Amino acid sequence: TPLTSITILFAAFLVSAAPFAQAQTVTINGRDDGYRGIWYMNQPSGDEYVYKYSGGLGTYCAKHIPFAWYSQETNRTYFCYGGTDVNNSTLFHMVSYFDHTTGRVAKPTCVLDKRTDDAHDNPVINLDDQGYVWIFSSSHGTARPSYISRSVRPYDIDQFQLMWSGNFSYPQPMYYPGKGFLFIHTWYVAGRGNYMMTSNPEGTVWTQRRELAYFEDGHYQISGVWNGMKTGIAFNMHPAGKGLNYRTNIYYMESDDFGATWRTVGGTILDIPLKSKTNPALVYEYESWPRNVYIKDTRFDSQGHPLILFVLSKGY
């Protein structure tokens, strides 16, 4: 099936909005004197490669979106990354910006200490239509809390306030002017389920968490936005019982009404949450090859057709 013929409409939902819970104070709001990204490793491999992957991972991973956001009003690109101390002993959530007028970067602000050295807890960033800078602080699984923080003043990184604490992984917040955030993320509940929440324009009231897909042993997903109108999500699946390092197939869904309904490009309405690996969202079947599928990006062409960047592999 060509990518230009994939769409997903998912059943409309209405959930009651609830205000953010009061969050525990963990903010630091201190300026650092330079840039130190977190170094991280994962899963000793017992061979010449030593680890499954390792290195400087301050902007890890591909499923954390976005790490940077351009503001036309200030001519700055605001960005975040996973920082650390001189001993690489903890993960700081850092925010700064590049000023395109002066060609200089600001000294970064340390928003909070995540109290881990796991780069899966790296933050992502976005700006709302009033210029407030938002930081979504991830967690690797459910053992640690996740946070949502907002700048005290528009376009300013000096001070952030904690808006919410709870739990989410692989955060992908997209802001729709006049509507609010459509927040795509993973929630570890006996696996890796695909979820979403939406907010009011101010980002202070959110819907309850909504499950989009959860079958076999879960998924990794990557979302993208077209023209401020449409959100698309590409994801794979972990076949049941085969372990984390086995992932296959490509699925895709999109919404053009702020997450109320989701469709295939062909207009097929999906029964959400998706609960079977055989469903209309399936784009390519690779389980029988067998091949691992690593989804790396979801974009759109000028006409709004989805483009999915992925890697095929015989192993990990």
Features from the language model and the residues they span:
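N-terminal secretory signal peptides that target proteins for export/translocation
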Residues: 1-3
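Extracellular, repeat-based ectodomains that mediate carbohydrate processing or recognition
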Residues: 24-316
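Bacterial N-terminal signal peptides
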Residues: 5-17
